[in-house]
Protein backbone atom coordinates (compact mmCIF):
# COMPACT_ATOMS: atom_id res chain seq x y z
CA UNK A 1 0.00 0.00 0.00
CA UNK A 2 2.85 2.38 0.85
CA UNK A 3 4.42 1.74 -2.56
CA UNK A 4 1.17 2.65 -4.31
CA UNK A 5 0.95 5.90 -2.32
CA UNK A 6 4.53 6.77 -3.16
CA UNK A 7 3.92 6.26 -6.86
CA UNK A 8 0.73 8.30 -6.67
CA UNK A 9 2.42 11.40 -5.29
CA UNK A 10 5.17 11.05 -7.87
CA UNK A 11 2.55 10.85 -10.62
CA UNK A 12 0.86 13.93 -9.17
CA UNK A 13 4.16 15.80 -9.22
CA UNK A 14 4.81 14.74 -12.82
CA UNK A 15 1.32 15.85 -13.77
CA UNK A 16 1.83 19.27 -12.21
CA UNK A 17 5.15 19.69 -14.02
CA UNK A 18 3.60 18.70 -17.36
CA UNK A 19 0.95 21.40 -16.88
CA UNK A 20 3.79 23.85 -16.27
CA UNK A 21 5.51 22.66 -19.46
CA UNK A 22 2.42 23.52 -21.51
CA UNK A 23 1.97 26.82 -19.68
CA UNK A 24 5.64 27.72 -20.06
CA UNK A 25 5.44 27.17 -23.82
CA UNK A 26 2.37 29.41 -23.95
CA UNK A 27 4.14 32.35 -22.33
CA UNK A 28 6.33 34.75 -24.31
CA UNK A 29 10.08 34.08 -24.34
CA UNK A 30 11.04 37.00 -22.08
CA UNK A 31 8.26 36.40 -19.54
CA UNK A 32 9.45 36.37 -15.92
CA UNK A 33 7.05 33.53 -15.13
CA UNK A 34 8.52 31.48 -17.98
CA UNK A 35 11.98 32.15 -16.59
CA UNK A 36 10.87 30.83 -13.18
CA UNK A 37 9.27 27.68 -14.64
CA UNK A 38 12.32 26.90 -16.76
CA UNK A 39 14.61 26.95 -13.72
CA UNK A 40 13.24 23.59 -12.61
CA UNK A 41 10.60 21.95 -14.81
CA UNK A 42 12.76 19.74 -17.05
CA UNK A 43 15.44 19.05 -14.40
CA UNK A 44 12.65 17.92 -12.07
CA UNK A 45 11.42 15.37 -14.63
CA UNK A 46 14.91 13.87 -14.87
CA UNK A 47 15.27 13.80 -11.07
CA UNK A 48 11.90 12.05 -10.74
CA UNK A 49 12.99 9.49 -13.34
CA UNK A 50 16.10 8.85 -11.27
CA UNK A 51 13.92 8.44 -8.18
CA UNK A 52 11.83 5.66 -9.76
CA UNK A 53 14.78 4.08 -11.58
CA UNK A 54 15.51 0.41 -10.87
CA UNK A 55 18.72 -1.13 -12.24
CA UNK A 56 17.96 -3.85 -14.78
CA UNK A 57 20.00 -5.56 -17.51
CA UNK A 58 20.28 -3.41 -20.62
CA UNK A 59 18.84 -6.19 -22.80
CA UNK A 60 15.52 -5.86 -20.93
CA UNK A 61 15.50 -2.15 -20.10
CA UNK A 62 16.76 -0.97 -23.52
CA UNK A 63 13.74 -2.18 -25.53
CA UNK A 64 11.43 -0.87 -22.79
CA UNK A 65 12.91 2.62 -23.00
CA UNK A 66 12.86 2.51 -26.81
CA UNK A 67 9.16 1.65 -26.79
CA UNK A 68 8.31 4.27 -24.18
CA UNK A 69 10.46 7.11 -25.50
CA UNK A 70 11.62 6.60 -29.09
CA UNK A 71 8.44 5.07 -30.50
CA UNK A 72 6.31 8.12 -29.53
CA UNK A 73 9.01 10.43 -30.92
CA UNK A 74 9.06 8.74 -34.33
CA UNK A 75 5.28 8.31 -34.40
CA UNK A 76 4.83 12.03 -33.77
CA UNK A 77 7.47 12.82 -36.40
CA UNK A 78 5.74 10.64 -38.97
CA UNK A 79 2.41 12.32 -38.19
CA UNK A 80 4.03 15.73 -38.66
CA UNK A 81 5.48 14.69 -42.03
CA UNK A 82 2.04 13.54 -43.22
CA UNK A 83 0.46 16.77 -41.94
CA UNK A 84 3.04 18.91 -43.75
CA UNK A 85 2.63 16.97 -47.00
CA UNK A 86 -1.13 17.59 -46.91
CA UNK A 87 -0.75 21.23 -45.90
CA UNK A 88 1.86 22.08 -48.55
CA UNK A 89 -0.15 20.22 -51.21
CA UNK A 90 -3.15 22.48 -50.60
CA UNK A 91 -1.08 25.65 -50.08
CA UNK A 92 1.24 25.49 -53.12
CA UNK A 93 0.87 22.07 -54.70
CA UNK A 94 4.51 22.15 -55.78
CA UNK A 95 6.41 18.88 -55.49
CA UNK A 96 9.64 20.77 -54.72
CA UNK A 97 8.00 22.33 -51.65
CA UNK A 98 6.68 18.96 -50.50
CA UNK A 99 10.13 17.37 -50.87
CA UNK A 100 11.72 20.28 -48.97
CA UNK A 101 9.37 19.95 -45.98
CA UNK A 102 9.56 16.15 -45.90
CA UNK A 103 13.36 16.28 -45.94
CA UNK A 104 13.50 19.08 -43.37
CA UNK A 105 11.09 17.34 -40.97
CA UNK A 106 12.73 13.92 -41.39
CA UNK A 107 16.18 15.30 -40.57
CA UNK A 108 14.74 17.26 -37.63
CA UNK A 109 13.15 14.05 -36.33
CA UNK A 110 16.42 12.11 -36.59
CA UNK A 111 18.39 14.80 -34.74
CA UNK A 112 15.55 15.61 -32.31
CA UNK A 113 17.08 19.00 -31.54
CA UNK A 114 15.19 21.35 -29.25
CA UNK A 115 16.50 24.40 -31.12
CA UNK A 116 17.14 25.56 -34.67
CA UNK A 117 20.69 25.33 -36.06
CA UNK A 118 22.33 23.39 -33.20
CA UNK A 119 26.08 23.89 -32.76
CA UNK A 120 28.04 21.93 -35.34
CA UNK A 121 24.89 21.10 -37.31
CA UNK A 122 23.64 24.48 -38.48
CA UNK A 123 21.59 22.95 -41.30
CA UNK A 124 19.31 21.13 -38.83
CA UNK A 125 15.96 22.58 -37.77
CA UNK A 126 14.24 22.20 -34.42
CA UNK A 127 12.02 19.26 -33.52
CA UNK A 128 10.55 21.16 -30.60
CA UNK A 129 9.82 19.82 -27.15
CA UNK A 130 10.32 16.18 -28.16
CA UNK A 131 14.06 16.73 -27.70
CA UNK A 132 13.27 15.56 -24.19
CA UNK A 133 12.32 12.03 -25.31
CA UNK A 134 15.61 11.48 -27.15
CA UNK A 135 17.65 12.92 -24.27
CA UNK A 136 15.79 10.82 -21.72
CA UNK A 137 16.28 7.64 -23.76
CA UNK A 138 20.05 8.01 -23.97
CA UNK A 139 20.30 9.21 -20.38
CA UNK A 140 18.52 6.08 -19.15
CA UNK A 141 20.74 3.88 -21.33
CA UNK A 142 23.86 5.52 -19.86
CA UNK A 143 22.45 5.18 -16.34
CA UNK A 144 21.74 1.47 -16.88
CA UNK A 145 25.30 0.92 -18.10
CA UNK A 146 26.74 2.74 -15.09
CA UNK A 147 24.60 0.91 -12.53
CA UNK A 148 25.12 -2.49 -14.16
CA UNK A 149 28.90 -2.20 -14.21
CA UNK A 150 29.60 -0.14 -11.08
CA UNK A 151 28.36 -1.66 -7.83
CA UNK A 152 29.69 0.91 -5.35
CA UNK A 153 27.50 3.98 -4.86
CA UNK A 154 30.53 6.25 -4.69
CA UNK A 155 31.71 5.02 -8.09
CA UNK A 156 28.23 5.41 -9.56
CA UNK A 157 28.02 8.98 -8.27
CA UNK A 158 31.47 9.80 -9.60
CA UNK A 159 30.68 8.37 -13.05
CA UNK A 160 27.40 10.30 -13.28
CA UNK A 161 29.13 13.53 -12.27
CA UNK A 162 31.93 12.84 -14.76
CA UNK A 163 29.29 12.25 -17.44
CA UNK A 164 27.82 15.68 -16.69
CA UNK A 165 31.23 17.34 -17.05
CA UNK A 166 31.90 15.50 -20.33
CA UNK A 167 28.47 16.49 -21.66
CA UNK A 168 29.05 20.15 -20.79
CA UNK A 169 32.48 20.14 -22.46
CA UNK A 170 31.08 18.52 -25.63
CA UNK A 171 28.15 20.96 -25.76
CA UNK A 172 30.53 23.91 -25.86
CA UNK A 173 31.40 22.91 -29.43
CA UNK A 174 28.78 20.39 -30.60
CA UNK A 175 25.11 19.79 -29.84
CA UNK A 176 25.01 16.12 -30.71
CA UNK A 177 22.25 14.28 -32.60
CA UNK A 178 19.55 12.81 -30.36
CA UNK A 179 20.80 15.20 -27.64
CA UNK A 180 23.41 12.72 -26.47
CA UNK A 181 25.37 15.56 -24.88
CA UNK A 182 22.28 16.57 -22.87
CA UNK A 183 21.85 12.91 -21.88
CA UNK A 184 25.33 13.07 -20.38
CA UNK A 185 24.67 16.42 -18.69
CA UNK A 186 21.52 15.16 -16.92
CA UNK A 187 23.20 12.07 -15.45
CA UNK A 188 23.78 14.07 -12.27
CA UNK A 189 20.04 14.84 -12.12
CA UNK A 190 19.24 11.15 -12.47
CA UNK A 191 21.71 10.17 -9.75
CA UNK A 192 20.38 12.89 -7.44
CA UNK A 193 16.91 11.41 -7.92
CA UNK A 194 18.25 7.94 -7.16
CA UNK A 195 19.99 9.25 -4.03
CA UNK A 196 16.78 11.00 -2.94
CA UNK A 197 15.29 7.57 -2.21
CA UNK A 198 17.67 7.35 0.76
CA UNK A 199 16.22 10.50 2.35
CA UNK A 200 13.17 10.25 4.61
CA UNK A 201 10.93 12.89 3.06
CA UNK A 202 8.59 12.68 6.06
CA UNK A 203 11.35 13.61 8.52
CA UNK A 204 10.89 17.34 9.15
CA UNK A 205 14.21 17.59 11.01
CA UNK A 206 15.91 16.73 7.73
CA UNK A 207 13.55 18.29 5.22
CA UNK A 208 13.00 21.75 6.75
CA UNK A 209 16.74 22.66 6.82
CA UNK A 210 17.18 21.09 3.36
CA UNK A 211 14.28 23.14 1.95
CA UNK A 212 15.67 26.33 3.49
CA UNK A 213 19.02 25.68 1.79
CA UNK A 214 17.23 24.96 -1.50
CA UNK A 215 15.19 28.16 -1.26
CA UNK A 216 18.34 30.21 -0.61
CA UNK A 217 20.22 28.65 -3.56
CA UNK A 218 17.28 29.06 -5.92
CA UNK A 219 16.61 32.60 -4.66
CA UNK A 220 20.21 33.73 -5.21
CA UNK A 221 20.17 32.33 -8.75
CA UNK A 222 16.84 34.07 -9.43
CA UNK A 223 18.14 37.38 -8.07
CA UNK A 224 21.19 37.12 -10.32
CA UNK A 225 18.97 36.18 -13.32
CA UNK A 226 20.59 32.78 -13.74
CA UNK A 227 18.78 31.25 -16.72
CA UNK A 228 18.42 27.50 -17.19
CA UNK A 229 17.37 25.97 -20.53
CA UNK A 230 18.48 22.40 -21.13
CA UNK A 231 17.51 22.36 -24.82
CA UNK A 232 19.90 25.30 -25.34
CA UNK A 233 22.51 23.86 -22.95
CA UNK A 234 22.20 27.12 -21.04
CA UNK A 235 23.30 27.64 -17.43
CA UNK A 236 24.17 31.34 -17.41
CA UNK A 237 25.84 31.13 -13.99
CA UNK A 238 27.29 27.61 -14.48
CA UNK A 239 27.65 26.05 -11.01
CA UNK A 240 25.00 28.19 -9.32
CA UNK A 241 22.39 27.75 -12.06
CA UNK A 242 22.94 23.98 -12.13
CA UNK A 243 22.63 23.81 -8.33
CA UNK A 244 19.54 26.03 -8.49
CA UNK A 245 17.89 23.68 -10.98
CA UNK A 246 18.33 20.84 -8.47
CA UNK A 247 17.18 23.05 -5.58
CA UNK A 248 14.07 24.19 -7.45
CA UNK A 249 13.27 20.59 -8.36
CA UNK A 250 13.60 19.52 -4.72
CA UNK A 251 11.20 22.27 -3.65
CA UNK A 252 8.54 21.20 -6.17
CA UNK A 253 8.97 17.49 -5.42
CA UNK A 254 8.74 18.02 -1.66
CA UNK A 255 5.71 20.30 -2.09
CA UNK A 256 4.00 17.54 -4.06
CA UNK A 257 4.73 15.10 -1.22
CA UNK A 258 3.23 17.49 1.33
CA UNK A 259 0.00 18.26 -0.52
CA UNK A 260 -0.50 14.68 -1.72
CA UNK A 261 -4.22 13.79 -1.56
CA UNK A 262 -5.03 17.14 0.07
CA UNK A 263 -5.82 18.99 -3.15
CA UNK A 264 -8.99 18.63 -5.20
CA UNK A 265 -7.17 18.17 -8.51
CA UNK A 266 -5.22 15.18 -7.17
CA UNK A 267 -6.78 12.59 -9.53
CA UNK A 268 -6.48 14.65 -12.75
CA UNK A 269 -2.84 15.46 -11.98
CA UNK A 270 -2.09 11.77 -11.33
CA UNK A 271 -3.79 10.88 -14.62
CA UNK A 272 -1.61 13.38 -16.47
CA UNK A 273 1.49 12.24 -14.60
CA UNK A 274 0.94 8.56 -15.40
CA UNK A 275 0.73 9.50 -19.08
CA UNK A 276 3.34 12.26 -19.07
CA UNK A 277 5.12 11.18 -22.27
CA UNK A 278 1.81 10.95 -24.13
CA UNK A 279 0.94 14.43 -22.87
CA UNK A 280 4.24 15.72 -24.27
CA UNK A 281 3.48 14.15 -27.67
CA UNK A 282 -0.03 15.65 -27.70
CA UNK A 283 1.47 19.02 -26.79
CA UNK A 284 3.87 18.63 -29.73
CA UNK A 285 0.98 17.77 -32.07
CA UNK A 286 -1.21 20.71 -31.09
CA UNK A 287 1.75 23.12 -31.19
CA UNK A 288 2.66 22.10 -34.75
CA UNK A 289 -0.68 21.19 -36.29
CA UNK A 290 -3.28 23.52 -34.79
CA UNK A 291 -3.08 27.08 -36.21
CA UNK A 292 -3.39 28.88 -32.88
CA UNK A 293 -2.29 32.19 -34.43
CA UNK A 294 -5.27 32.01 -36.79
CA UNK A 295 -7.70 30.87 -34.09
CA UNK A 296 -6.42 33.44 -31.59
CA UNK A 297 -5.01 36.43 -33.50
CA UNK A 298 -3.58 39.35 -31.60
CA UNK A 299 -0.68 40.22 -29.35
CA UNK A 300 1.09 37.02 -28.13
CA UNK A 301 2.02 38.86 -24.90
CA UNK A 302 -1.61 39.70 -24.07
CA UNK A 303 -2.53 38.12 -20.71
CA UNK A 304 -6.05 37.37 -21.94
CA UNK A 305 -4.74 35.60 -25.04
CA UNK A 306 -2.19 33.61 -23.01
CA UNK A 307 -4.86 32.40 -20.58
CA UNK A 308 -7.32 31.46 -23.34
CA UNK A 309 -4.62 29.68 -25.36
CA UNK A 310 -3.45 27.76 -22.30
CA UNK A 311 -7.02 26.69 -21.50
CA UNK A 312 -7.66 25.57 -25.10
CA UNK A 313 -4.37 23.65 -25.23
CA UNK A 314 -5.13 21.95 -21.92
CA UNK A 315 -8.63 20.98 -23.04
CA UNK A 316 -7.29 19.53 -26.30
CA UNK A 317 -4.61 17.54 -24.47
CA UNK A 318 -6.96 16.20 -21.77
CA UNK A 319 -9.71 15.21 -24.22
CA UNK A 320 -7.22 13.56 -26.59
CA UNK A 321 -5.48 11.81 -23.69
CA UNK A 322 -8.78 10.47 -22.34
CA UNK A 323 -9.78 9.12 -25.75
CA UNK A 324 -6.32 7.59 -26.27
CA UNK A 325 -6.32 5.82 -22.89
CA UNK A 326 -9.85 4.48 -23.46
CA UNK A 327 -8.86 3.11 -26.86
CA UNK A 328 -5.74 1.48 -25.37
CA UNK A 329 -7.75 -0.10 -22.56
CA UNK A 330 -10.33 -1.45 -25.02
CA UNK A 331 -7.56 -2.86 -27.22
CA UNK A 332 -5.87 -4.56 -24.26
CA UNK A 333 -9.14 -6.10 -23.08
CA UNK A 334 -9.90 -7.39 -26.55
CA UNK A 335 -6.37 -8.75 -26.91
CA UNK A 336 -6.62 -10.56 -23.56
CA UNK A 337 -10.02 -11.96 -24.48
CA UNK A 338 -8.74 -13.30 -27.81
CA UNK A 339 -5.73 -14.80 -26.01
CA UNK A 340 -7.97 -16.62 -23.53
CA UNK A 341 -10.22 -17.91 -26.31
CA UNK A 342 -7.20 -19.22 -28.23
CA UNK A 343 -5.96 -21.05 -25.13
CA UNK A 344 -9.36 -22.65 -24.60
CA UNK A 345 -9.51 -23.79 -28.22
CA UNK A 346 -6.16 -25.60 -28.04
Feature-to-residue mapping (PLM):
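Alpha-helical transmembrane segments and their immediate juxtamembrane cytosolic regions
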Residues: 1-346
